[in-house]
Amino acid sequence: MSNSASSFADVSSGCTAGTPVPADSPIRDNIADAVRRVRETTPLAQSFTNFVTINLVANAQLAAGGTAAMSFLPDDVIETAKIAGANYINVGTLLPFYKDALPEIAQRLNYLDKPWVLDPVAAGIGHTRTAILQTFKAAPPTMIRANASEVIALANMWGLNTETVGDASEHRPAGVESVDDVESATGAAVALAQYLTEQHAKHSSHDASTRCAVAVSGIADLVTDGETVYRLPGGSAMMTKITGAGCSLGGVAATYLAVSDPLTAALSASLLYNRAAEIADTTSHGPGSFQVAFLDALWNVTAEQVAESEILVQ
């Protein structure tokens, strides 16, 4: 392991407290199964993502073993959603027509009972983005993948976060970067996961006992289904030096959502990314070679390596 990888791992583990998930836990079996199923079945996950990172999103989905489709017009998205296993919406770069298109797409996905992942990039910045994200409360996703500031901002926006100290305007992303640590987003993440689960239980034809999930990326990732909070130490600081690491994680989470329940999908995608980043860090020499090595690691890392990663219950 390189110096940067080892130092990041030390910081990641050091800032996280919790009880380790046992090696024989069914959670680990579910994660390994999800990784294998994606590689065996190559599920289609459709993405409505931003222009800056669209290439990495597609390549990461392919490297994880899935199939990618990038769509933007509502009729294209809805028709593709009928054959896709899951869908992904990322609001990182906006065009004027998105203000009408994205709410329509979200409503149709929910009407068709199609699972989808939301990445509320830069939540809290700009009236158009805020208006779009507010409409998703009435047509919520199955999973949310975001950084800590975005999770806090979205929970405040939806009137769900009662644990944030101070005015909601204080908790805003700096562009697409988080200004809050993962720990501070715990209450918001739990509240969002509970809300998503409640709404899908009312309107979905799927098993009402299935819980939705929220994944918060950071030094030690957090994943919750609204009942249990998991922390996932690991990864590499180099992930912050390539554009689209978080966006592509959302796309891969959608790939896993096509073959598994939301919690398993969120855990599997986050752990896959952490393990692949650690492997890539040992052979790369900078951001360019790291991105190439990272995609190779997504392709080569085994289901067992992913499932054996450190998982803590908070």
From Swiss-Prot:
Domain of life: Bacteria
EC number: 2.7.1.50
Entry annotated with the keyword Zinc: no
Pfam families in alphabetical order: HK (PF02110)
Residue ranges of coiled coil: none
Signal peptide segment: none
GO MF term list: ATP binding; hydroxyethylthiazole kinase activity; magnesium ion binding
Swiss-Prot/TrEMBL cofactor(s): Mg(2+)
Stored CDD domains: THZ_kinase
Annotated residues for binding of ATP: R145, S217
Gene3D superfamilies xref list: 3.40.1190.20
Biased amino acid composition, Low complexity: 1-13
One GO process term, biological-process aspect: thiamine biosynthetic process
Pathway: Cofactor biosynthesis; thiamine diphosphate biosynthesis; 4-methyl-5-(2-phosphoethyl)-thiazole from 5-(2-hydroxyethyl)-4-methylthiazole: step 1/1
Binding-site residues for substrate, renumbered to this chain: M70, G244
Residues covered by region (Disordered): 1-24
Reaction catalysed by this enzyme: 5-(2-hydroxyethyl)-4-methylthiazole + ATP = 4-methyl-5-(2-phosphooxyethyl)-thiazole + ADP + H(+)
Top EC class of this enzyme: transferase
Function: Catalyzes the phosphorylation of the hydroxyl group of 4-methyl-5-beta-hydroxyethylthiazole (THZ).
Family: Belongs to the Thz kinase family.
Name this protein carries in UniProt: Hydroxyethylthiazole kinase
